[in-house]
Amino acid sequence: MSTEFNYATGRRKTAVARTRLYPGNGTIKINGRPLENYFPRKSLQMIIRQPLVHTKLLDKYDIKINVSGGGVSGQAEAVRHGISRALLEVNPELRSLLKPVGFLTRDARQKERKKYGLRAARAKYQYSKR
């Protein structure tokens, strides 16, 4: 792999994906492991490949990603966000393809905090009339 790369960060919930894009042939490594090993579920693999498929650049770049925090779904969406932003670093003209489908938008929804006197953020404790 060459030393020339484009870097971008993707986030979702508490997951952070640091993405490096190298010119290459389409291999994706996440935390040093192949995509298929790190995310065995096909649906998550599809989510990660979406920006590359949408821009028709699936076999043009090698991607190395360090991802931490969150769960598997949050991590997959953070990786998608990171790849989209890295592609934008390479070619700003891709914005017109990536922006309308929402790949560049940071999903800012976070877990709502638990309130005292309640069982969860909004759920009440079960009430027994008798």
Curated annotation (Swiss-Prot):
The keyword tRNA-binding does not apply. One of its GO terms (molecular function) is structural constituent of ribosome. GO terms for biological process: translation. Pfam families: Ribosomal_S9. SUPFAM superfamilies: Ribosomal protein S5 domain 2-like (SSF54211). It comes from the Bacteria. Signal peptide: none annotated. InterPro entries: Ribosomal_Su5_D2-typ_SF, Ribosomal_uS9, Ribosomal_uS9_bac/plastid, Ribosomal_uS9_CS, Ribsml_uS5_D2-typ_fold_subgr. The keyword Phosphoprotein does not apply. Belongs to the universal ribosomal protein uS9 family. This is Small ribosomal subunit protein uS9. It comes from Lawsonia intracellularis (strain PHE/MN1-00). The gene is rpsI.
